[in-house]
Amino acid sequence: AGSYYSYRRRRCSPRRLYRLRRRRYRSSRRRRRRPCRRRRHRRVCRRVRRRRRCCRRR
């Protein structure tokens, strides 16, 4: 867990991540839930989505 957190911190600054999350949350709240209907895939989708969201654009 520790290595994962250090990796996240290195890639994306907390302030920018927070701002990005707040702005995206409203717009994609409805749309995002659809793709993963299965209970098993929801966690995976969420994890991938979060990583991509914070680190994709620099």
From Swiss-Prot:
GO terms for cellular component: nucleosome; nucleus. Residues 20-41 are annotated as: Disordered. The keyword Mitochondrion does not apply. One of its GO terms (biological process) is spermatogenesis. Testis. GO terms for molecular function: DNA binding. Keywords: Chromosome, Developmental protein, Differentiation, DNA condensation, DNA-binding, Nucleosome core, Nucleus, Spermatogenesis. The keyword Nucleotidyltransferase does not apply. It is found in: Nucleus; Chromosome. Its main location: nucleus. Transmembrane segments: none annotated. Protamines substitute for histones in the chromatin of sperm during the haploid phase of spermatogenesis. They compact sperm DNA into a highly condensed, stable and inactive complex. Belongs to the protamine P2 family. This is Sperm histone P2b.
